[in-house]
């Protein structure tokens, strides 16, 4: 079978999505696909001066866009959502090429963008304020919400388009243009989204730079977060990144919305439905090759059902379809993003055994016929205790299994990590579920019952507590 020319495919997709050739070729930043490890594009990088120019253009656009009535801004977002529907498969293919996701996940990510546009269109007629009684006779208090200004958005490689849309759709209906720094590993999808939005805006009579893209490494990110022309910066990434971004924005009295790492756990009670648990746990742990901020990383299992649970999971792991999703639609687990991610996984597994844990299954490199890519066998690791390693987030498909005797002990283990994004419990009864969902249960921003912790649903506020940053997106916030 002839190998497809993925660089040519990427160029064709970008052209079809309206990206100017000068933005996606002829540059010095080499974009490799995790599917094969080959270069699929060479894009120009931005400089600090480019960031300054982009923020200046966004400020000028803000003066005009914020004067457009909210419902009319909502019409532009509605049209953008429709354009995404028209190009859903093309954009999803680009997500798969650039981020290595399987087709269903890529299509689901674009659908999240569409759903977010639908939510924001409704909000465009509801953004208002409050009228309150005053203690002074003949007066009333009015709280009125006004557009904030240009918004900076920093996104990660694992959700290269959806997280931007969570921010962009709401910012746009509120009157705020955006300056977007995608991960330098996945800038092509950003260029495509910005191009689609720009075309929609121009067709509606708004020749304004509503979503500019700046591409580059940490220096570009620093220039963005330190720019005083951005009253708000929304940043998605690691806890380490957030610890750098937050103080930089605060130093200039800006606002930051941080969506950072997770070390998500699920509790399996002694009378849980183990077949339901198996299905939920497997995808939560191995989906996106364990590269979601909501991926399941710790499984806290009652000692009475621990052996049976591990046996069921190990059997399922041994049957996982791992490989190149571009060539095989049946694949469930695609590649890690790059060699650095693979090295991090191997280092974590070596450290786990040094700390007394045992690898039940997986952990090795998988032969997918792509020697320059990094496919791995998802690992299950039994740990006698919640060691320092288990308290860290390793962005790879490693599931640590811990045992407990009493529910209070399980919840204590669950909460005894720095991060607090998503969580789950598998109980047959409401009492355990309510205990977990209550104020003395999970300390995460998201709690699930009888389903996995991975994923998000538009309309419900997404975000976490503690070292996850405290930000909320895509919902009632």
Residue positions per predicted region:
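N-terminal Rossmann-like NAD(P)+-binding subdomain of aldehyde/semialdehyde dehydrogenases
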Residues: 1-139
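Conserved C-terminal structural/oligomerization subdomain of aldehyde/semialdehyde dehydrogenase
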Residues: 36-41, 205, 267, 368-477
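Residue-level signal for inorganic ion chemistry
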Residues: 37, 73, 95, 117, ...
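Structural signal for hydrophobic packing residues in well-ordered secondary-structure cores
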Residues: 62, 66, 81-88, 92, ...
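Rossmann-like NAD(P) dinucleotide-binding subdomain of oxidoreductase/dehydrogenase enzymes
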Residues: 129-276, 330, 404
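Terminal low-complexity tails and localization/encapsulation signals of metabolic enzymes
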Residues: 1-43, 75, 79, 129-155, ...
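ALDH superfamily catalytic-core signature
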Residues: 199, 240-385, 412, 449
């Amino acid at each position: 079978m002839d190998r497809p020319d993925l660089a040519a495919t990427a160029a064709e997709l970008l052209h079809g999505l309206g990206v100017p050739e000068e933005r996606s070729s002829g540059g010095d930043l080499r974009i490799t696909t995790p599917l094969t490890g080959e270069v699929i594009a060479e894009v120009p990088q931005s400089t600090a001066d480019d960031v300054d120019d982009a923020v200046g253009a966004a400020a000028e656009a803000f003066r005009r866009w914020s004067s457009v009535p909210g419902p009319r801004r909502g019409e532009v977002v509605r049209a953008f959502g429709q354009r995404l529907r028209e190009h859903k498969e093309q954009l999803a293919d680009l997500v798969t090429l650039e981020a290595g996701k399987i087709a269903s996940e890529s299509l689901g990510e674009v659908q999240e963008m569409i759903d977010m546009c639908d939510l924001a269109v409704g909000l465009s007629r509801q953004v208002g304020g409050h009228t309150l009684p005053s203690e002074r006779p003949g007066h009333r208090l009015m709280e009125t919400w006004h557009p904030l200004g240009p918004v900076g958005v920093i996104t990660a490689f694992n959700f290269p388009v959806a997280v931007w849309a969570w921010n962009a759709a709401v910012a746009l209906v509120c009157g705020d243009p955006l300056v977007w720094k995608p991960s330098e590993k996945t800038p092509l999808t950003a260029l495509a989204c910005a191009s689609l939005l720009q075309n929609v805006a121009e067709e509606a009579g708004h020749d304004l730079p509503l979503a500019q893209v700046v591409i580059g490494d940490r220096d570009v990110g620093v220039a963005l977060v330190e720019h005083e022309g951005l009253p708000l910066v929304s940043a998605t990434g690691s806890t380490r990144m957030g610890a750098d971004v937050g103080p930089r924005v605060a130093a200039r009295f800006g606002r930051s919305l941080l969506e950072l790492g997770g070390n998500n756990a699920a509790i399996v009670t002694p009378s849980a439905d183990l077949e339901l648990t198996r299905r939920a746990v497997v995808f939560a742990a191995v989906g996106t090759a364990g590269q979601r901020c909501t991926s399941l990383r710790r499984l806290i299992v009652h000692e009475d059902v621990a052996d049976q649970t591990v046996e069921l999971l190990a059997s399922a792991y041994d049957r996982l379809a791992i490989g190149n999703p571009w060539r095989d639609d049946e694949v469930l687990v695609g590649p890690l993003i790059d060699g650095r991610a693979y090295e991090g996984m191997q280092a974590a597994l070596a450290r786990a055994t040094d700390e007394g844990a045992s690898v039940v299954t997986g952990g090795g490199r998988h032969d997918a016929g792509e020697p320059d890519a990094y496919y791995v066998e998802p690992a299950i690791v039994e740990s006698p205790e919640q060691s320092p390693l288990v308290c860290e987030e390793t962005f790879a498909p490693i599931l640590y299994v811990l045992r407990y005797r009493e529910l209070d002990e399980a919840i204590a283990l669950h909460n005894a990590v720095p991060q607090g994004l998503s969580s789950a419990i598998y109980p047959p009864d409401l009492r355990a579920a309510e205990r977990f969902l209550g104020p003395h249960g999970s300390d995460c921003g998201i709690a699930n019952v009888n389903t996995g912790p991975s994923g998000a649903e538009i309309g419900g506020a997404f975000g976490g507590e503690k070292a996850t940053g405290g930000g909320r997106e895509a919902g009632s916030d």
